[in-house]
């Protein structure tokens, strides 16, 4: 055989075990069962373990170098040990204050404010450093792709483009129990008959657990392009790390080519500048993602996972402008701005054809109820982010 078969088992992207497979002399259509002994692996709390098999060329050939990756596959192993739970009562004390403008939470070295006007987290700072620049907002739109334009998505789903900014706060409730502040905010967009319930839990270490639940009452509405949140981050937060699929962009219906692992890079490099500006840079099955400036940062830990992207420009720069000459290489440039999109999902990109076909129905966010959760964890430069991601508060 002109191929070599290797395997590796990783936990938190650290090699636990590895080896080579013998020659697999199989005819087309034949199969063979491989057995891996996992008894020597001692799982650590909260760590996922993956087996990755790679097939590479053994010899150099015309047009194909030696060691060229021909095929690979990844398997999540049935090895898991639950993370250690931290009791919120063991953390530093926090205080909750209510006023006409909303609810304010103060703890040791941090502050979180939830305003009636925005209906979301509006201020979040640690040691005097703002971790978000403006109030969070519900984000239900995506910049149309070429496939979207071909199937009329901008017109069909126009109802959702500004649904997040149209929402009005109906209820804002705050309470303090077991050294945990709970804030429940109910927002309503009457035009789309949509209710968004946001539940925040704030802890004494500055972590904030976020749960977003959306309910669409009218079943006749078009699919929703995306369900998520958008955060305007400090412009100095130009470094991103994540544990999820990568390193390239991936989507709900386009993700099996992206392996789960630990990746890092600049925020700017996560965008691909297509000739016509459009949706770009999405990552799927994210266990955690962190933005930082090297000195301080913010992690979003999925509960259990989320999709998302980061952009060194306003995400709206990618939006379609009919009859415009906007060019991705010329007009999409890095700015003094970082947008962080943390999503439940966005609809698939489709591609059966580009002149009318929508994404398959099971990759659409049709009128229904959807919810997802994640937890913000502030950190300082140099912290072990894999270790930090194992924090579990209950």
Predicted regions and their residues:
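Intrinsically disordered, low-complexity Pro/Gly/Ser/Thr-rich segments with frequent PxxP/GP/PP motifs
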Residues: 5-64
């Amino acid at each position: 055989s002109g191929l070599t078969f290797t395997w590796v088992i990783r936990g938190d992207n650290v090699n636990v075990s590895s080896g080579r497979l013998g020659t697999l002399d199989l005819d087309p259509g034949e199969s063979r069962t491989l057995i891996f002994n996992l008894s020597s692996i001692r799982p650590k709390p909260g760590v996922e373990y993956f087996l990755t098999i790679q097939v590479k060329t053994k010899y150099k050939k015309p047009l194909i170098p030696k060691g060229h990756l021909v095929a690979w596959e990844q398997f999540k192993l049935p090895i898991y040990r639950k993370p250690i739970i931290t009791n919120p009562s063991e953390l530093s004390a926090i205080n909750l204050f209510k006023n006409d403008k909303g609810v304010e939470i103060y703890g040791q070295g941090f502050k979180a404010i939830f305003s009636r006007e925005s209906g979301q987290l509006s201020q979040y700072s640690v040691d005097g450093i703002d971790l978000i620049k403006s109030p969070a907002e519900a984000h239900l739109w995506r910049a149309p792709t070429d496939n979207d334009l071909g199937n009329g998505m901008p017109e069909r789903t126009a109802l959702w483009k500004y649904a997040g900014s149209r929402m009005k706060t109906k209820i804002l409730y705050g309470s303090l129990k077991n050294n945990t502040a709970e804030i429940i905010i109910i927002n309503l967009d009457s035009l789309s008959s949509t209710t968004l319930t946001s539940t925040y839990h704030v802890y004494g270490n500055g972590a904030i657990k976020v749960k977003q639940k959306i309910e669409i009452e009218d079943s006749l509405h078009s699919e929703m392009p995306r369900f998520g949140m958008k955060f305007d981050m400090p412009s100095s937060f130009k470094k991103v790390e994540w544990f999820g699929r990568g390193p390239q962009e991936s989507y709900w219906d386009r993700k099996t080519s992206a392996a789960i692992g630990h990746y890092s890079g600049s925020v700017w490099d996560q965008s691909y500048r297509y000739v016509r500006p459009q949706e770009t840079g999405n990552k799927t099955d994210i266990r955690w993602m962190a933005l930082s400036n090297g000195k301080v940062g913010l992690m979003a830990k999925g509960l259990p996972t989320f999709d998302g992207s980061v952009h060194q420009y306003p995400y709206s720069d990618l939006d379609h402008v009919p009859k415009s000459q906007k060019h991705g290489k010329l007009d999409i440039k890095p700015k003094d701005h970082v947008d962080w999109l943390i999503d439940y999902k966005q609809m698939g990109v489709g591609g059966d054809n580009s002149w009318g076909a929508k994404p398959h129905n099971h990759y659409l966010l049709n009128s229904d109820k959807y919810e997802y959760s994640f937890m913000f964890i502030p950190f300082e430069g140099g912290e072990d982010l894999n270790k930090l991601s194992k924090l579990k508060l209950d």
